[in-house]
């Protein structure tokens, strides 16, 4: 029986990927459709992807599939054909091709079965996820941006919105999608007469969010087909103005795709214009935050002087200090400071 999981260390896999001479293409896709046995589907897809040297992150659930992957350029069309043949529900599926791609987005294939392909926190048995809002194409998006009766709702996390968003788009301040859904309903209660346009990175979150808004009594709901990625691609192809400002945050090694030249965010340490996310180099922290080149040199890639000092300690002492610490997701929130940290480190902006 073939091995259906990775057995090589991350460091070795990354080194192998960086040594590759063939270019790679970063692709994302999703599909809401019923999967009777996600574990069986997972194993079959794992073999298909491995045979084509595909890396990336794939989630499967009874409700469908969500994938962000890296495919050798010479295998892209073969991958597309085999994916379309895998299940009738996947035939003709839109594949979002990365806009700003160095081919180094992933170096290992991780494929997991989950309860949901997007953690939404919805437990209402009457919710119909298929009753979604209407799709918008690039030209229609631009027209809506000029419509005074339209409100654009960003269904991404705060750190994604911080580095890039559509003109005048409303941020739903939250750290997770499950937190955003009830907040979006609450914040829009006074605007039920408005046209609500929802968007996200590649479409998966705003599609479900549009259905949730309709479930909660909002009738004028649209969402951008293919999200920011497809909008920017189509706008450029059609010679339309690209109305997304800044950088599109992505959840892979790149951490962002440049959409426009504007830098709308600031370094979390010194306040200089910057939109480059990084993880703190201290293995006991790994906080996600924005750091400019000057501060990266000053703090040696760390989020604070304390982390800088700790990362310089002998490995044994670092491990001793990390023992017993929680290791949750740590994200810098400009409005609330450090989240989920156990180091007791001051806010990096102070």
Swiss-Prot record:
Transmembrane domains' residue ranges: none
One GO-annotated biological process of the protein: tRNA modification
InterPro entries: Rhodanese-like_dom (IPR001763), Rhodanese-like_dom_sf (IPR036873), Rhodanese_C (IPR022111), TrhO (IPR020936), TRHO_N (IPR040503)
Disulfide-bonded cysteines: none
Pfam families on file: Rhodanese (PF00581), Rhodanese_C (PF12368), UPF0176_N (PF17773)
PROSITE patterns tied to this protein: RHODANESE_3
GO molecular function, one term: oxidoreductase activity, acting on paired donors, with incorporation or reduction of molecular oxygen
EC assignment: 1.14.-.-
UniProt keyword annotation of Cell membrane present: no
Active site per UniProt: 200 (cysteine persulfide intermediate)
Keywords assigned by UniProt, alphabetized: Oxidoreductase, tRNA processing
Task of the protein: Catalyzes oxygen-dependent 5-hydroxyuridine (ho5U) modification at position 34 in tRNAs, the first step in 5-carboxymethoxyuridine (cmo5U) biosynthesis. May be part of an alternate pathway, which is able to bypass cmo5U biogenesis in a subset of tRNAs under aerobic conditions.
Family, similarity comment: Belongs to the TrhO family.
Protein name: tRNA uridine(34) hydroxylase
Organism of this sequence: Escherichia coli (strain SE11)
